[in-house]
From Swiss-Prot:
GO biological process: translation
Name of the gene encoding the protein in the UniProt record: rps4e
Pfam families cross-referenced by the UniProt entry: Ribosomal_S4e, RS4NT, S4
GO annotations of cellular component type: cytosolic small ribosomal subunit
Name of the protein this chain belongs to: Small ribosomal subunit protein eS4
A GO molecular-function annotation: RNA binding
CDD domains: KOW_RPS4, S4
Keywords assigned: Ribonucleoprotein, Ribosomal protein, RNA-binding, rRNA-binding
InterPro entries: Ribosomal_eS4, Ribosomal_eS4_central_region, Ribosomal_eS4_central_sf, Ribosomal_eS4_KOW, Ribosomal_eS4_N, S4_RNA-bd, S4_RNA-bd_sf
Length: 238
């Protein structure tokens, strides 16, 4: 389907529910799921306000004026999600999609120096020919690495990825003491030090606790992303 009923769209989408018609653009199949992505056209029209109508938003995108992770995207339905880097070519403005307590996901202005950097969470690993390991990331990206490097990087760890050179710049293990941020659920946007993990049979459902000052928030392991050893390795908050 090309469209989605407004009333069925994810609650965090910045669209009116009872105005603007019955339908809204549905994200095309891609790197992020419907629940955790926003169509590129809605970002241009409803978030950044570069367009007043869907027709104008589609025109801007079709002209190649918008890049996602350094690649020109001409599909107005392209799904944009967590940690994606959006660049408006004519103005040079660059934004990162970050978890936010109020908006669920928000666009954070970043410098052009950071435009080539992206945090990726490892969702799984597989062995491939030649005794190498392929890493699977949260944005659908895959990367083949050596057996030695692949063994060190665990599922749910994060890596700092160089979009231009297509290479890992840093490895951030998800372990006690690491700085992490909640990326889904009711505590989305909360960041702090990971100070407790209660393991369960289903690893994704293990309970973790993040602490920031005197405040403690608990969520499940699947909702947490490591962002740095002592602090975020890139800008993820204002």
């Amino acid at each position: 389907m090309v469209h989605l009923r407004r009333t069925l769209a994810p609650a965090w989408w910045p669209i009116p529910r009872k105005k603007g018609g019955v339908w809204v653009v549905r994200p095309s199949p891609g790197p992020h799921s419907l629940a955790y992505s926003l169509p590129l056209a809605l970002i241009i029209r409803d978030v950044l306000k570069y367009a007043k109508t869907m027709h104008e938003a589609r025109y801007i995108i079709s002209r190649g004026y918008v890049k996602v992770d350094g690649v020109v995207r001409r599909d107005y339905k392209f799904p944009v999600g967590l940690m994606d880097v959006i660049e408006i070519v004519p103005t040079g403005e660059v934004y990162r999609v970050v978890p936010d307590a109020d908006k669920y996901y928000n666009l954070l202005p970043i410098s052009t120096e950071e435009a080539a950097l992206k945090l990726l969470r490892v969702e799984g690993k597989t062995m491939v020919k030649g005794g190498r390991i392929q890493l699977h990331f949260h944005d659908g990206r895959n990367l083949i690495t050596t057996l030695e490097a692949g063994k060190q990087i665990k599922t749910f760890d994060s890596v700092l990825y160089d979009l231009r050179n297509k290479a890992i710049k840093a490895h951030i293990p998800l372990k006690l003491g690491v700085n992490a941020v909640v990326i889904h659920g009711s505590n989305v946007g909360f960041s702090g030090t990971l100070y407790e993990i209660v393991w369960t049979l289903k690893r994704k459902q293990s309970v973790v606790a993040l602490k920031k000052g005197d405040e403690v928030r608990r969520t499940i392991l699947n909702y947490v992303m490591a962002v740095g050893s002592e602090g975020p390795v890139i800008k993820i908050s204002p």
